């Protein structure tokens, strides 16, 4: 995968505990405490992020051919819009009036934290071209998960400009 020739293995995790903390943090970097493994783990361990609170972890990871983490993203299945700091209640209402079901939806974000930053986390030692390709693969994986699971939509909240461009924004 570092040269772009190997296939990435995408996995969906039900808990941040399913990924090695050091490997996650290697992708997350050290500049943003809200995307580090320990912070996301504390949200799960405290019960703040759990299915019964409307935040079901669905983290995406991409492993290289040796099983090492190359990319990851904090992703959640949401049954409401609380804790997102994006006020889409009117969207949900309009969706329902049109006969649709807005929830569950898929959200790539940091729970309860309206702080901008990267959401598509890539190992920094990979070449720039591979990093962009992996970010696109993460987004494609989220879209596929949303479609396969019957989610109404995919949201990526408070991302940085570079990640926004990958998403088409």
Which residues does each predicted region cover?
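N-acyltransferase acceptor-side catalytic subdomain
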Residues: 1-169
């Amino acid at each position: 995968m570092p040269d772009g020739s190997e296939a990435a293995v995408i996995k969906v995790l039900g808990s941040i505990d399913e990924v090695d903390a050091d490997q996650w943090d290697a992708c997350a970097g050290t500049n943003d405490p809200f995307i580090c493994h320990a912070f996301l783990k504390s949200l799960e361990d405290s019960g703040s992020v759990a299915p019964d609170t409307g935040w079901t972890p669905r983290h995406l990871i991409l492993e290289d051919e040796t099983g090492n983490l190359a990319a990851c993203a904090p992703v959640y299945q949401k049954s409401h819009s609380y804790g997102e700091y994006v006020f889409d209640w009117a969207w949900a209402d309009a969706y329902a009036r049109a006969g649709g079901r807005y929830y569950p939806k898929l959200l790539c974000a940091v729970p309860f934290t309206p702080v901008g930053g990267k959401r598509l986390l890539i190992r920094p030692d990979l070449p720039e071209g591979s990093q962009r390709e992996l970010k696109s693969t993460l987004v494609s994986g989220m879209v596929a998960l949303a479609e396969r699971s019957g989610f109404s939509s995919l949201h990526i909240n408070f991302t940085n400009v570079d990640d926004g461009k990958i998403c088409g924004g």
